[in-house]
Amino acid sequence: MKKCWSVLTDDMGSCYITHLGVAHIHHVFNGSRKKASEERGFLVPLHPTLHTYGPDSVHMKPNQGLDLRLKQECQRYYEEHYGTREEFIKEFGRSYL
């Protein structure tokens, strides 16, 4: 199993939001951009209710609420450390800011 890392947190064993010790690893940008999420560190540990099981989870409400917040945080990081907004859009399909 390869080691997961995140630009958002050093603690991959606890939920980024609740800090509880039960966490699923969420690819902030998924689908065809899943590999880019792994390469850029755009992974985040989330409690299962925030990841897939809750009514407001990132997979139940894509591009809204928490999912949008995480995408925006990652885009800001990208623009500060990796490249321009135009390069972000080329790599991840659109701007979330």
Predicted regions mapped to residue ranges:
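Short, charged surface segments at domain edges that flank catalytic/cofactor-binding sites
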Residues: 1-14, 34-41
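Amphipathic alpha-helical interface surfaces
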Residues: 24, 42-46, 74
